[in-house]
Amino acid sequence: MSLRIIFMGTPDFSVPTLRALVEAGHEIVAVYTQPPRPGGRRGLDLQKSPVHQVAELLGLPVLTPVNFKAEEDRQQFRDFNADVAVVVAYGLLLPEAILSGTRLGCYNGHASLLPRWRGAAPIQRAIMAGDAETGMMVMKMEKGLDTGPVALTAKVAIDENMTAGELHDSLMLAGARLMRQAMAKLEADDLPLVTQAEEGVLYAAKIDKGETRIDFSRPAQDVHNHIRGLSPFPGAWLEMDIGGKPERVKVLASELASGMGEAGSALDDALTIACGSDAVRLTRLQKAGGKPMSAADFVRGTPVPATTRLG
């Protein structure tokens, strides 16, 4: 026995779940993903999403509607006669006609311990807030934003120096395992659903470019969380004088350090920077248009002597 599944996802994060469902023997009757976007060096080439590319390799039918406003798109979805839709980082809000368009509904893989961090950026927000753990949850979708009842949970610890990129990869694999388990239970009519708690609701707003600059007047722990929560994308940044002019430099990794001084000033020549309290050591950086490099390589080409002001 197997389920007839419509899979809906777009980025790399979604791919292991799609593969896991195929490997489990389910029938993927359609794959929905975001339409190809301009890309390439000049932005002239249309690039298919990671899910689109993998689905084609697997010989699965792919659909790329811009939205589901047209009745013909909604009817096409229903006409697949799917048992269930599995949604992982699809990127479109689903109307009621889609949520109710399969026999058993839509199940979403969400990267947080709901109701904490509902919304668009749960991985980044968990790290930026200094959370010690997060996880993947499979929930049955309803009209509200990530408000549906939870079926299964897999917790993942957040190490003190873990970046959003590293956590993304851990959750990506945990989510694939969890969704495979959830679909097996759903097929066996043994998938429990638990209503989310009303307490502890937090929303993970999309990262705004205006909040990515590093503010060294904050405590060192906050600065460290900010850096790792935005690494590798979009990247926390600071401004420093390079060749007599101010330039942006992304900071991709850091660690807590001891030391005191004026916030934003270098305490040594190894990129230990004073914060509002204590200090952070910048360990991986990237100049505009350049490749990421270690702090040692960075200061070898761009010395940052003690007392240098950064920000």
Swiss-Prot record:
Q: Which residues bind (6S)-5,6,7,8-tetrahydrofolate?
A: 112-115
The reactions it catalyses are:
L-methionyl-tRNA(fMet) + (6R)-10-formyltetrahydrofolate = N-formyl-L-methionyl-tRNA(fMet) + (6S)-5,6,7,8-tetrahydrofolate + H(+)
Q: Which InterPro entries match?
A: Fmt, Formyl_trans_C, Formyl_transf_N, Formyl_transf_N_sf, Formyl_transferase-like_C_sf, GART_AS, Met-tRNA-FMT_C, Met-tRNA-FMT_N
Q: What is its EC number?
A: 2.1.2.9
Q: Write down the Pfam families for this protein, in alphabetical order.
A: Formyl_trans_C, Formyl_trans_N
Q: Which is one Gene Ontology cellular component term of this protein?
A: cytosol
Keyword entries, A-Z:
Protein biosynthesis, Transferase
Domain of life, per the record?
Bacteria
One GO MF term, please?
Answer: methionyl-tRNA formyltransferase activity
Family that this chain belongs to: Belongs to the Fmt family.
NCBIfam families xrefs: fmt
Q: Which HAMAP family match?
A: Formyl_trans (MF_00182)
State the protein's purpose: Attaches a formyl group to the free amino group of methionyl-tRNA(fMet). The formyl group appears to play a dual role in the initiator identity of N-formylmethionyl-tRNA by promoting its recognition by IF2 and preventing the misappropriation of this tRNA by the elongation apparatus.
Q: What is this protein called?
A: Methionyl-tRNA formyltransferase
Species annotation:
Agrobacterium fabrum (strain C58 / ATCC 33970) (Agrobacterium tumefaciens (strain C58))
**Gene name, Swiss-Prot/TrEMBL:** fmt
